[in-house]
Amino acid sequence: MTMHDTPSGLNWDLGLAPPADGLWCGLRLVAELTQADQPLPADAPACLVVQGGMLRWVGPQAQLPAAFSALRRFDARDAARTGAHGAAPGAPGTLATPALVDCHTHLVYGGQRADEFALRLAGASYEALAQAGGGILASVQATRAASEDQLFALAMPRLQALLAEGVGAIEIKSGYGLALEHERKQLRVARRLGQACAVTVRTSFLGAHALPPEYAGRSQDYIDLVCQQMLPALAEQGLVDAVDMFCERIAFTLAETEQVFLAAQQLGLPVKLHAGQLSDMGGAALAARYGALSCDHLEHLSADAIAAMQAAGTVAVLLPGAWYTLRGQQRPPIEALRAAGVPMAVATDHNPGSSPALSLLLMAHMACTLFHLSLSEALAGITTHAARALGLQDSHGLIAAGRPANFVLWPLQEAAELVYWLGHKPACTIVRQGRVVRDGLGLLDRPEMPVLRDGA
Protein backbone atom coordinates (compact mmCIF):
# COMPACT_ATOMS: atom_id res chain seq x y z
CA MET A 1 0.00 0.00 0.00
CA THR A 2 1.35 3.39 -0.96
CA MET A 3 1.88 6.25 1.44
CA HIS A 4 0.21 9.50 0.41
CA ASP A 5 1.31 13.05 1.29
CA THR A 6 -1.63 15.43 1.42
CA PRO A 7 -2.33 19.08 2.13
CA SER A 8 -3.84 18.07 5.45
CA GLY A 9 -0.42 16.93 6.68
CA LEU A 10 -1.54 13.32 7.03
CA ASN A 11 0.88 10.67 5.85
CA TRP A 12 -0.21 7.19 6.83
CA ASP A 13 -0.74 3.63 5.75
CA LEU A 14 -3.46 1.65 7.52
CA GLY A 15 -1.29 -1.45 7.35
CA LEU A 16 1.30 0.32 9.52
CA ALA A 17 -1.15 1.99 11.89
CA PRO A 18 -1.32 0.26 15.28
CA PRO A 19 -4.42 -1.63 16.34
CA ALA A 20 -6.86 0.15 18.61
CA ASP A 21 -7.51 -2.98 20.68
CA GLY A 22 -7.87 -2.15 24.36
CA LEU A 23 -9.87 0.04 26.75
CA TRP A 24 -10.55 3.60 25.63
CA CYS A 25 -11.29 5.28 28.93
CA GLY A 26 -12.11 8.77 30.15
CA LEU A 27 -14.58 9.53 27.37
CA ARG A 28 -17.70 11.64 26.99
CA LEU A 29 -20.17 10.04 24.61
CA VAL A 30 -23.05 11.76 22.84
CA ALA A 31 -26.21 9.95 23.95
CA GLU A 32 -27.99 10.40 20.62
CA LEU A 33 -25.02 8.89 18.76
CA THR A 34 -24.41 6.00 21.16
CA GLN A 35 -26.07 2.69 21.93
CA ALA A 36 -24.59 1.83 25.31
CA ASP A 37 -24.64 -1.49 27.12
CA GLN A 38 -25.45 0.40 30.34
CA PRO A 39 -27.07 3.83 30.86
CA LEU A 40 -24.59 6.69 30.49
CA PRO A 41 -24.55 9.19 33.39
CA ALA A 42 -23.91 12.70 32.12
CA ASP A 43 -21.32 13.45 34.81
CA ALA A 44 -19.26 10.23 34.67
CA PRO A 45 -16.63 9.08 32.17
CA ALA A 46 -17.45 6.36 29.68
CA CYS A 47 -15.37 3.56 28.20
CA LEU A 48 -15.14 1.75 24.87
CA VAL A 49 -13.73 -1.78 24.59
CA VAL A 50 -12.09 -2.63 21.27
CA GLN A 51 -11.07 -6.21 20.47
CA GLY A 52 -10.22 -7.58 17.06
CA GLY A 53 -11.02 -4.23 15.53
CA MET A 54 -14.60 -4.38 16.83
CA LEU A 55 -16.39 -2.52 19.60
CA ARG A 56 -17.15 -5.14 22.26
CA TRP A 57 -18.59 -3.01 25.06
CA VAL A 58 -19.80 0.57 25.46
CA GLY A 59 -20.82 2.08 28.78
CA PRO A 60 -19.91 3.88 32.00
CA GLN A 61 -16.30 3.34 32.97
CA ALA A 62 -17.31 2.48 36.53
CA GLN A 63 -19.35 -0.46 35.25
CA LEU A 64 -16.71 -1.98 32.99
CA PRO A 65 -17.06 -5.79 33.11
CA ALA A 66 -14.18 -7.48 34.92
CA ALA A 67 -13.49 -9.64 31.86
CA PHE A 68 -12.07 -6.59 30.08
CA SER A 69 -10.17 -4.99 32.96
CA ALA A 70 -6.77 -6.45 32.04
CA LEU A 71 -6.75 -5.02 28.52
CA ARG A 72 -4.36 -2.28 27.48
CA ARG A 73 -5.68 1.17 28.41
CA PHE A 74 -5.85 4.35 26.38
CA ASP A 75 -6.69 6.99 28.98
CA ALA A 76 -8.26 10.00 27.30
CA ARG A 77 -9.58 11.80 30.37
CA ASP A 78 -6.86 14.45 30.42
CA ALA A 79 -5.89 14.24 26.76
CA ALA A 80 -7.89 17.26 25.58
CA ARG A 81 -6.05 20.40 26.57
CA THR A 82 -7.78 23.23 28.38
CA GLY A 83 -8.16 26.56 26.65
CA ALA A 84 -9.95 27.84 23.58
CA HIS A 85 -10.54 24.40 22.09
CA GLY A 86 -9.73 22.14 25.02
CA ALA A 87 -11.72 20.22 27.58
CA ALA A 88 -13.34 22.15 30.39
CA PRO A 89 -11.83 21.68 33.85
CA GLY A 90 -13.84 19.03 35.65
CA ALA A 91 -15.36 17.65 32.44
CA PRO A 92 -16.02 13.89 32.65
CA GLY A 93 -13.66 13.11 29.78
CA THR A 94 -12.71 13.60 26.16
CA LEU A 95 -15.49 13.92 23.60
CA ALA A 96 -15.97 10.82 21.42
CA THR A 97 -18.28 10.44 18.43
CA PRO A 98 -18.77 7.92 15.67
CA ALA A 99 -16.63 8.53 12.61
CA LEU A 100 -18.39 11.00 10.33
CA VAL A 101 -20.18 9.95 7.14
CA ASP A 102 -20.26 12.07 3.96
CA CYS A 103 -23.21 10.60 2.07
CA HIS A 104 -23.17 12.68 -1.14
CA THR A 105 -20.02 13.55 -3.10
CA HIS A 106 -18.83 13.84 -6.70
CA LEU A 107 -15.21 13.41 -5.65
CA VAL A 108 -13.74 12.03 -8.88
CA TYR A 109 -13.46 14.52 -11.74
CA GLY A 110 -11.03 16.37 -13.96
CA GLY A 111 -10.49 20.10 -14.06
CA GLN A 112 -12.27 22.77 -12.04
CA ARG A 113 -14.89 25.44 -12.77
CA ALA A 114 -13.64 28.61 -11.15
CA ASP A 115 -14.51 30.45 -14.36
CA GLU A 116 -18.18 29.64 -13.81
CA PHE A 117 -17.95 30.93 -10.27
CA ALA A 118 -16.83 34.26 -11.69
CA LEU A 119 -19.66 34.21 -14.25
CA ARG A 120 -22.25 33.53 -11.56
CA LEU A 121 -20.88 36.42 -9.53
CA ALA A 122 -21.46 38.57 -12.61
CA GLY A 123 -25.09 37.44 -12.80
CA ALA A 124 -25.16 34.23 -14.85
CA SER A 125 -27.47 31.53 -13.50
CA TYR A 126 -26.64 27.86 -12.98
CA GLU A 127 -29.32 26.91 -15.51
CA ALA A 128 -28.06 29.37 -18.12
CA LEU A 129 -24.51 28.06 -17.83
CA ALA A 130 -25.75 24.48 -18.19
CA GLN A 131 -27.87 25.31 -21.22
CA ALA A 132 -24.86 27.01 -22.84
CA GLY A 133 -22.82 23.80 -22.59
CA GLY A 134 -21.07 24.59 -19.33
CA GLY A 135 -21.86 23.24 -15.90
CA ILE A 136 -21.80 19.46 -15.71
CA LEU A 137 -20.76 19.14 -19.36
CA ALA A 138 -17.64 21.22 -18.73
CA SER A 139 -16.59 18.69 -16.11
CA VAL A 140 -17.50 15.84 -18.47
CA GLN A 141 -15.05 17.16 -21.04
CA ALA A 142 -12.23 17.46 -18.49
CA THR A 143 -12.97 14.06 -16.95
CA ARG A 144 -13.05 12.29 -20.29
CA ALA A 145 -9.68 13.82 -21.14
CA ALA A 146 -8.04 12.52 -17.95
CA SER A 147 -6.65 9.03 -17.46
CA GLU A 148 -7.69 6.80 -14.60
CA ASP A 149 -4.39 7.39 -12.84
CA GLN A 150 -4.72 11.15 -13.28
CA LEU A 151 -8.22 11.11 -11.81
CA PHE A 152 -6.96 9.02 -8.89
CA ALA A 153 -4.15 11.50 -8.21
CA LEU A 154 -6.58 14.43 -8.35
CA ALA A 155 -9.15 12.80 -6.08
CA MET A 156 -6.73 11.56 -3.40
CA PRO A 157 -6.07 14.93 -1.68
CA ARG A 158 -9.79 15.70 -1.76
CA LEU A 159 -10.53 12.44 0.02
CA GLN A 160 -7.66 12.91 2.47
CA ALA A 161 -8.99 16.34 3.46
CA LEU A 162 -12.28 14.75 4.45
CA LEU A 163 -10.63 11.82 6.22
CA ALA A 164 -8.45 14.19 8.26
CA GLU A 165 -11.64 15.76 9.60
CA GLY A 166 -12.90 12.41 10.89
CA VAL A 167 -14.88 11.03 7.95
CA GLY A 168 -14.92 7.23 8.06
CA ALA A 169 -17.38 6.43 5.27
CA ILE A 170 -18.12 8.27 2.06
CA GLU A 171 -20.26 8.04 -1.05
CA ILE A 172 -18.61 8.75 -4.42
CA LYS A 173 -20.67 9.18 -7.57
CA SER A 174 -19.81 8.85 -11.22
CA GLY A 175 -21.67 11.14 -13.64
CA TYR A 176 -18.84 13.09 -15.27
CA GLY A 177 -18.15 10.42 -17.88
CA LEU A 178 -21.57 9.91 -19.51
CA ALA A 179 -20.14 7.10 -21.64
CA LEU A 180 -19.41 3.54 -20.58
CA GLU A 181 -15.62 3.71 -20.60
CA HIS A 182 -15.52 7.01 -18.75
CA GLU A 183 -18.18 6.10 -16.17
CA ARG A 184 -16.24 2.89 -15.58
CA LYS A 185 -13.07 4.94 -15.15
CA GLN A 186 -14.67 7.11 -12.45
CA LEU A 187 -16.10 4.15 -10.56
CA ARG A 188 -12.80 2.27 -10.72
CA VAL A 189 -11.08 5.28 -9.20
CA ALA A 190 -13.67 5.37 -6.42
CA ARG A 191 -12.97 1.71 -5.62
CA ARG A 192 -9.21 2.33 -5.70
CA LEU A 193 -9.56 5.25 -3.31
CA GLY A 194 -11.40 3.06 -0.83
CA GLN A 195 -8.72 0.39 -1.04
CA ALA A 196 -5.79 2.80 -0.86
CA CYS A 197 -7.14 4.61 2.20
CA ALA A 198 -8.93 1.63 3.78
CA VAL A 199 -12.07 3.72 4.09
CA THR A 200 -15.64 2.60 3.43
CA VAL A 201 -16.62 3.90 -0.02
CA ARG A 202 -20.10 3.46 -1.45
CA THR A 203 -20.32 4.08 -5.18
CA SER A 204 -23.33 5.50 -7.00
CA PHE A 205 -23.72 5.18 -10.75
CA LEU A 206 -24.91 8.58 -11.97
CA GLY A 207 -24.87 7.96 -15.70
CA ALA A 208 -28.09 9.97 -16.02
CA HIS A 209 -26.54 13.16 -14.67
CA ALA A 210 -26.81 15.19 -17.86
CA LEU A 211 -27.34 14.58 -21.57
CA PRO A 212 -23.92 14.16 -23.23
CA PRO A 213 -23.28 16.39 -26.24
CA GLU A 214 -23.20 13.48 -28.69
CA TYR A 215 -26.81 12.70 -27.69
CA ALA A 216 -28.12 16.26 -27.99
CA GLY A 217 -31.81 16.10 -28.86
CA ARG A 218 -31.88 12.32 -28.29
CA SER A 219 -32.61 12.01 -24.60
CA GLN A 220 -34.55 8.75 -24.91
CA ASP A 221 -31.75 7.11 -26.88
CA TYR A 222 -29.30 8.02 -24.13
CA ILE A 223 -31.54 6.72 -21.35
CA ASP A 224 -31.91 3.46 -23.29
CA LEU A 225 -28.10 3.26 -23.44
CA VAL A 226 -27.85 3.87 -19.69
CA CYS A 227 -30.41 1.19 -18.86
CA GLN A 228 -29.55 -1.46 -21.42
CA GLN A 229 -25.77 -1.25 -21.68
CA MET A 230 -23.99 1.00 -19.20
CA LEU A 231 -25.68 0.02 -15.95
CA PRO A 232 -25.72 -3.76 -16.57
CA ALA A 233 -22.05 -3.77 -17.60
CA LEU A 234 -20.87 -1.73 -14.63
CA ALA A 235 -23.01 -3.70 -12.18
CA GLU A 236 -21.61 -6.98 -13.52
CA GLN A 237 -18.11 -5.68 -12.81
CA GLY A 238 -19.03 -4.96 -9.19
CA LEU A 239 -18.56 -1.23 -9.52
CA VAL A 240 -22.05 -0.08 -8.53
CA ASP A 241 -23.51 0.01 -5.01
CA ALA A 242 -26.49 2.25 -5.85
CA VAL A 243 -28.03 4.07 -8.81
CA ASP A 244 -28.59 7.82 -8.80
CA MET A 245 -29.84 10.31 -11.37
CA PHE A 246 -30.79 13.96 -11.81
CA CYS A 247 -34.53 14.56 -12.23
CA GLU A 248 -34.79 18.21 -13.19
CA ARG A 249 -35.91 20.44 -16.05
CA ILE A 250 -32.28 20.87 -17.18
CA ALA A 251 -31.63 17.12 -16.89
CA PHE A 252 -34.12 14.23 -17.14
CA THR A 253 -37.89 13.82 -16.94
CA LEU A 254 -39.96 11.87 -14.45
CA ALA A 255 -40.63 9.14 -17.03
CA GLU A 256 -36.93 8.81 -17.80
CA THR A 257 -36.19 8.65 -14.09
CA GLU A 258 -38.61 5.78 -13.64
CA GLN A 259 -37.05 3.92 -16.55
CA VAL A 260 -33.65 4.07 -14.84
CA PHE A 261 -35.17 3.04 -11.51
CA LEU A 262 -36.79 0.02 -13.14
CA ALA A 263 -33.44 -1.00 -14.64
CA ALA A 264 -31.79 -0.68 -11.22
CA GLN A 265 -34.59 -2.66 -9.59
CA GLN A 266 -34.14 -5.50 -12.08
CA LEU A 267 -30.47 -5.68 -11.09
CA GLY A 268 -31.26 -5.60 -7.37
CA LEU A 269 -29.62 -2.22 -6.85
CA PRO A 270 -30.98 0.47 -4.51
CA VAL A 271 -31.76 3.90 -5.91
CA LYS A 272 -31.37 7.51 -4.83
CA LEU A 273 -32.18 10.78 -6.56
CA HIS A 274 -31.11 14.37 -7.08
CA ALA A 275 -34.58 15.85 -6.67
CA GLY A 276 -36.23 19.22 -6.23
CA GLN A 277 -33.10 21.34 -6.54
CA LEU A 278 -34.50 23.85 -9.04
CA SER A 279 -38.14 22.77 -9.36
CA ASP A 280 -40.60 20.15 -8.16
CA MET A 281 -41.01 17.57 -10.91
CA GLY A 282 -42.36 14.87 -8.61
CA GLY A 283 -39.04 13.04 -8.42
CA ALA A 284 -38.93 12.63 -4.64
CA ALA A 285 -42.36 10.99 -4.52
CA LEU A 286 -41.36 8.64 -7.34
CA ALA A 287 -38.08 7.76 -5.64
CA ALA A 288 -39.92 6.99 -2.42
CA ARG A 289 -42.21 4.60 -4.30
CA TYR A 290 -39.08 2.70 -5.30
CA GLY A 291 -37.83 2.64 -1.70
CA ALA A 292 -34.99 5.06 -2.39
CA LEU A 293 -32.17 5.25 0.12
CA SER A 294 -32.24 9.02 -0.16
CA CYS A 295 -33.51 12.04 -2.03
CA ASP A 296 -30.99 14.87 -2.16
CA HIS A 297 -31.23 18.70 -2.44
CA LEU A 298 -35.03 19.01 -1.92
CA GLU A 299 -35.44 22.76 -2.01
CA HIS A 300 -38.73 22.21 -3.89
CA LEU A 301 -40.71 19.46 -2.19
CA SER A 302 -44.44 18.81 -1.87
CA ALA A 303 -46.31 17.63 1.21
CA ASP A 304 -47.26 14.43 -0.63
CA ALA A 305 -43.60 13.73 -1.39
CA ILE A 306 -42.66 14.27 2.25
CA ALA A 307 -45.33 11.79 3.33
CA ALA A 308 -44.09 9.28 0.76
CA MET A 309 -40.50 9.65 1.94
CA GLN A 310 -41.53 9.13 5.54
CA ALA A 311 -43.49 6.00 4.68
CA ALA A 312 -40.59 4.58 2.67
CA GLY A 313 -37.90 5.45 5.21
CA THR A 314 -36.13 7.56 2.59
CA VAL A 315 -33.53 9.95 3.99
CA ALA A 316 -33.63 13.64 3.05
CA VAL A 317 -30.05 14.65 2.26
CA LEU A 318 -29.49 18.38 2.68
CA LEU A 319 -26.74 20.05 0.67
CA PRO A 320 -26.22 23.55 2.06
CA GLY A 321 -22.95 24.04 0.19
CA ALA A 322 -24.70 23.93 -3.18
CA TRP A 323 -27.57 26.10 -1.94
CA TYR A 324 -25.08 28.68 -0.66
CA THR A 325 -22.83 28.66 -3.73
CA LEU A 326 -25.76 29.00 -6.13
CA ARG A 327 -27.37 31.69 -3.95
CA GLY A 328 -30.49 29.64 -3.41
CA GLN A 329 -33.69 31.48 -2.63
CA GLN A 330 -35.91 28.63 -1.47
CA ARG A 331 -34.78 26.50 1.45
CA PRO A 332 -35.71 22.84 1.90
CA PRO A 333 -38.93 22.54 3.95
CA ILE A 334 -37.15 21.63 7.18
CA GLU A 335 -40.14 22.16 9.47
CA ALA A 336 -42.33 19.89 7.35
CA LEU A 337 -39.63 17.20 7.14
CA ARG A 338 -39.11 17.42 10.88
CA ALA A 339 -42.82 17.24 11.65
CA ALA A 340 -43.22 14.20 9.41
CA GLY A 341 -40.30 12.40 11.03
CA VAL A 342 -38.22 12.17 7.85
CA PRO A 343 -34.56 11.54 8.80
CA MET A 344 -32.33 14.37 7.59
CA ALA A 345 -28.69 13.94 6.62
CA VAL A 346 -26.12 16.59 5.69
CA ALA A 347 -23.37 16.15 3.08
CA THR A 348 -20.69 18.17 1.34
CA ASP A 349 -21.94 17.47 -2.21
CA HIS A 350 -18.31 18.05 -3.13
CA ASN A 351 -18.17 18.85 -6.83
CA PRO A 352 -16.29 21.34 -9.01
CA GLY A 353 -19.30 23.45 -9.92
CA SER A 354 -21.88 24.08 -7.23
CA SER A 355 -20.18 22.91 -4.02
CA PRO A 356 -16.35 22.83 -4.02
CA ALA A 357 -16.48 22.07 -0.29
CA LEU A 358 -14.12 19.77 1.61
CA SER A 359 -15.36 20.17 5.18
CA LEU A 360 -18.30 18.16 6.45
CA LEU A 361 -18.19 20.05 9.75
CA LEU A 362 -18.60 23.32 7.88
CA MET A 363 -21.60 21.86 6.06
CA ALA A 364 -23.12 20.93 9.43
CA HIS A 365 -22.64 24.52 10.58
CA MET A 366 -24.27 25.81 7.39
CA ALA A 367 -27.18 23.40 7.78
CA CYS A 368 -27.86 25.00 11.16
CA THR A 369 -27.36 28.63 10.18
CA LEU A 370 -28.90 28.51 6.69
CA PHE A 371 -31.48 25.71 6.96
CA HIS A 372 -32.26 26.04 10.69
CA LEU A 373 -31.39 22.51 11.78
CA SER A 374 -30.88 22.02 15.49
CA LEU A 375 -27.46 21.01 16.79
CA SER A 376 -28.62 17.47 17.48
CA GLU A 377 -30.14 17.21 14.00
CA ALA A 378 -26.89 18.39 12.42
CA LEU A 379 -24.81 15.89 14.40
CA ALA A 380 -27.14 13.03 13.49
CA GLY A 381 -27.08 14.34 9.93
CA ILE A 382 -23.34 13.73 9.54
CA THR A 383 -23.35 10.40 11.37
CA THR A 384 -26.42 8.24 12.00
CA HIS A 385 -28.73 9.52 9.26
CA ALA A 386 -25.91 9.87 6.75
CA ALA A 387 -25.03 6.21 7.29
CA ARG A 388 -28.66 5.29 6.69
CA ALA A 389 -28.62 7.24 3.41
CA LEU A 390 -25.90 4.85 2.23
CA GLY A 391 -27.46 1.68 3.61
CA LEU A 392 -24.69 1.54 6.24
CA GLN A 393 -26.90 1.98 9.30
CA ASP A 394 -25.81 -1.37 10.76
CA SER A 395 -22.08 -0.61 10.66
CA HIS A 396 -21.51 3.16 10.69
CA GLY A 397 -22.78 6.35 12.26
CA LEU A 398 -23.35 5.00 15.78
CA ILE A 399 -21.08 3.91 18.62
CA ALA A 400 -22.38 0.50 19.68
CA ALA A 401 -21.04 -2.91 20.65
CA GLY A 402 -20.84 -5.36 17.76
CA ARG A 403 -19.84 -2.72 15.22
CA PRO A 404 -16.44 -2.02 13.66
CA ALA A 405 -14.35 0.41 15.72
CA ASN A 406 -14.82 3.65 13.77
CA PHE A 407 -14.73 6.62 16.12
CA VAL A 408 -13.10 10.00 16.68
CA LEU A 409 -11.87 11.71 19.85
CA TRP A 410 -12.08 15.51 19.84
CA PRO A 411 -10.31 18.17 21.98
CA LEU A 412 -13.57 20.02 22.54
CA GLN A 413 -15.67 20.90 25.57
CA GLU A 414 -18.99 19.77 24.11
CA ALA A 415 -20.44 18.19 20.99
CA ALA A 416 -21.97 21.51 19.91
CA GLU A 417 -18.44 22.75 19.15
CA LEU A 418 -18.20 20.37 16.22
CA VAL A 419 -20.84 22.52 14.53
CA TYR A 420 -19.98 25.83 16.19
CA TRP A 421 -16.40 26.50 15.03
CA LEU A 422 -15.82 27.86 11.51
CA GLY A 423 -12.73 26.64 9.67
CA HIS A 424 -11.30 24.94 12.76
CA LYS A 425 -9.63 21.57 12.20
CA PRO A 426 -9.44 19.94 15.64
CA ALA A 427 -6.36 17.84 16.41
CA CYS A 428 -8.43 14.70 16.75
CA THR A 429 -7.51 11.09 17.31
CA ILE A 430 -9.09 8.89 14.63
CA VAL A 431 -9.78 5.18 14.87
CA ARG A 432 -10.86 3.63 11.60
CA GLN A 433 -11.54 -0.05 11.00
CA GLY A 434 -10.03 -0.84 14.37
CA ARG A 435 -6.72 0.99 13.84
CA VAL A 436 -5.41 4.32 15.08
CA VAL A 437 -4.78 6.22 11.87
CA ARG A 438 -4.19 9.55 13.58
CA ASP A 439 -3.26 10.34 17.18
CA GLY A 440 -3.73 14.08 17.38
CA LEU A 441 -4.36 13.85 21.13
CA GLY A 442 -1.18 11.86 21.81
CA LEU A 443 -2.84 8.91 23.54
CA LEU A 444 -0.51 6.16 22.44
CA ASP A 445 2.10 5.11 24.96
CA ARG A 446 4.49 3.75 22.31
CA PRO A 447 5.83 6.77 20.39
CA GLU A 448 7.74 4.53 18.01
CA MET A 449 4.44 3.39 16.52
CA PRO A 450 3.92 4.86 13.01
CA VAL A 451 0.93 7.06 13.76
CA LEU A 452 0.78 10.74 12.90
CA ARG A 453 0.84 13.12 15.84
CA ASP A 454 0.41 16.88 15.56
CA GLY A 455 3.29 18.43 13.67
CA ALA A 456 4.47 15.11 12.25
From Swiss-Prot:
Protein's name according to its UniProt entry: Imidazolonepropionase
Function: Catalyzes the hydrolytic cleavage of the carbon-nitrogen bond in imidazolone-5-propanoate to yield N-formimidoyl-L-glutamate. It is the third step in the universal histidine degradation pathway.
Any single biological process term in GO: L-histidine catabolic process to glutamate and formamide
Residues that hold 4-imidazolone-5-propanoate according to the record: R113, Y176, H209, Q277, S354
Signal peptide: none
GO molecular function: imidazolonepropionase activity; iron ion binding; zinc ion binding
Pathway: Amino-acid degradation; L-histidine degradation into L-glutamate; N-formimidoyl-L-glutamate from L-histidine: step 3/3
Presence of keyword Mitochondrion: no
Cofactor binding note from Swiss-Prot or TrEMBL: Binds 1 zinc or iron ion per subunit.
UniProt-annotated binding residues for Fe(3+): H104, H106, H274, D349
E.C. number: 3.5.2.7
Cofactor(s) listed in the protein's UniProt record: Zn(2+); Fe(3+)
Residues reported to bind N-formimidoyl-L-glutamate: Y176, N351, G353
Localization terms from the record: Cytoplasm
Family from the record: Belongs to the metallo-dependent hydrolases superfamily. HutI family.
Alphabetized InterPro entries for the sequence: Amidohydro-rel (IPR006680), HutI (IPR005920), Metal-dep_hydrolase_composite (IPR011059), Metal_Hydrolase (IPR032466)
Top-level EC class as recorded in UniProt: hydrolase
Binding site for Zn(2+): H104, H106, H274, D349
Catalytic activity line of the entry: 4-imidazolone-5-propanoate + H2O = N-formimidoyl-L-glutamate
GO cellular component: cytoplasm
Record key words, sorted: Cytoplasm, Histidine metabolism, Hydrolase, Iron, Metal-binding, Zinc
